[in-house]
């Protein structure tokens, strides 16, 4: 999940680390032709448009639709959910992104999309007077900013605000979004720690109900808060879940469900066919699906949020579930209540206890940890190694993070239309 300079410091998340040694996909000479478009009264001359196929039209979801994800791990990677992005605009790509229920908005490693003549590790190349670049259905603005990830291990991505359609999935089924804001990053600062490395990691596919933000240096927040990211944005702006930019038909509710994923095989996601697809993501919900879940209403807008009530056509809601009771029994015992985030982007369980809590500072492996949501749903697991590794931040008084371990045995849903979260 994202922790930015504008988010509540109590909101804690998973480790997010990336190397910039990505392999740039081979692109035909035709696809490499570029159109530089002058905008906003700029004086630069525009070159001839690139001859390319138009972006794929947005997919309409009329029934709950299963899309493959690629859960995996390796000797150098913690267990991670991966969604394959197969095109950005009309540019064919093969970009494994972390499917992240703990953050909102999409970040894309620019060097895997654009030719070296357009972007380097220092940034995008704009001709004199140019304020935007149009490339095969992708718009890159000259708004430079950052997105920040992590807590103990922190990274800061540097890039530009852009706009494009995204196609994700694989040969078994794909979904194309409407045109949406994306963050096209070209470099990453590693403030501390280590973690996922490119070319395995190419960015984040954030699907949380909340807001994310692209921070622009020198921005002054208006009284009513920053706005949603648009082609007119010149300062810090908000992005939201990629799943909110899907065309949902009248027969379904906007949102998604994740099915249990017990297997995170060791494989190489960069080698085609090496990692097995798993049909764990269902796009679009209906009453039959939701009726079997224990649900709670989301807090909309998030506590402390100042900005548009709706972005992308749906309410901006808090990803933290308030008043979750967490208890340990067995070798370690104790109970506390806090906010909790169910986060596919965290490879362990992070328990942030209140100041003065009687909850133990360490959960001994073999102890049972249980969580009870306000809806009465209870989830339990046995603390141990791997995704069951349980880290206690004694007295941190922030949100607890319920990571990948939950998703190995249980279902999870987010309904953007009704602003509901569900478990079973």
Task: Describe every region a protein language model picked out.
Residues 23-29:
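Sec-dependent signal peptide recognition
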Residues 1-20:
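N-terminal secretory signal peptides that target proteins for export/translocation
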Residues 40-424:
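Pepsin/retropepsin-fold aspartyl endopeptidases
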Residues 35-38:
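C-terminal motif of bacterial Sec signal peptides marking the signal peptidase cleavage site
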